[in-house]
């Protein structure tokens, strides 16, 4: 039996890495918050539950989002406080962000996804940081190499990840990894989930 798990990266238009250099010093009024009720209505209509990987500053802006998500049977998870690439953070700063998000969510968050899927050999410390804060799973691994992120020779099904084994099951790993979905398009293997791919690929494919 195949099991599909839906994760939604809840971030605004100014959060993606490619946009940030152009809007870094500008004030932002989050617009995505206005769409949360519509998203939840669509999920209810399709009898679907989802995990919302939340950028923490959006929850700071409107704390009521938390109850809206949880009361409708969905899950909250961490996507950093400001959508910072992991390469821009230290372990200490990341731990502080985890504490902040824990306070915002009353300890409800047990999962994490790295912005821009920036988990790599240089940022593998994040696995230990998540374990220190009693997190249960990660969903940052893209099991195909792209220009910006991803891995080669990676397991496609969920596996136990560790800071020394980011792509294959580590029997001693304590954190569960849910890799992103990939598929073939015109004979080329590529990710088929995530905002860019959902916009770019035909509806039947994505």
Regions found by a protein language model. Name each.
Residues 1-4, 46-50, 72-75, 106-110, ...:
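Short, well-ordered coil/turn segments that N-cap beta-strands
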Residues 114-206:
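Active-site-adjacent pocket scaffolds in enzyme catalytic domains
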Residues 10-12, 56-58, 80-84, 116-118, ...:
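Active-site-proximal loop/turn and secondary-structure-junction residues that shape catalytic pockets
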Residues 1-72, 141:
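Active-site beta->alpha N-cap acidic-glycine motif
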Residues 37-45, 49, 91-123, 128-137:
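CE4/NodB-like, metal-dependent polysaccharide N-deacetylase domain
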Residues 74, 78-92, 110:
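Structural motif corresponding to the early beta-alpha repeats
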Residues 9, 43, 52, 76-79, ...:
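Conserved, mostly hydrophobic/aromatic
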């Amino acid at each position: 039996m195949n099991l599909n798990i839906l994760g939604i990266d809840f971030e605004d238009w100014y959060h993606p890495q490619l946009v940030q250099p152009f809007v870094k010093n500008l004030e932002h009024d989050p617009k995505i918050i206005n769409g949360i009720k519509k998203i939840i209505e669509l999920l209810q209509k399709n009898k679907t539950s989802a995990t919302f990987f939340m950028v923490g500053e959006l929850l700071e802006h409107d704390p009521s989002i938390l109850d809206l998500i949880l009361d409708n049977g969905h899950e909250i998870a961490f996507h950093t406080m400001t959508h910072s690439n992991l390469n821009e953070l230290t372990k200490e700063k990341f731990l502080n962000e985890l504490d902040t998000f824990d306070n915002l969510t009353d300890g409800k968050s047990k999962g994490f996804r790295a912005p821009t899927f920036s988990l790599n050999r240089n940022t593998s410390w994040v696995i230990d940081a998540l374990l220190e804060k009693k997190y249960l799973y990660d969903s940052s691994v893209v099991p195909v190499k792209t220009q910006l992120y991803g891995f080669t020779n990676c397991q496609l099904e969920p596996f136990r990840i560790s800071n020394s084994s980011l792509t294959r099951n580590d029997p001693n790993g304590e954190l569960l990894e849910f890799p992103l979905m990939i598929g073939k398009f015109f004979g080329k293997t590529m990710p088929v989930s995530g905002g860019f791919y959902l916009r770019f690929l035909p509806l039947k494919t994505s």
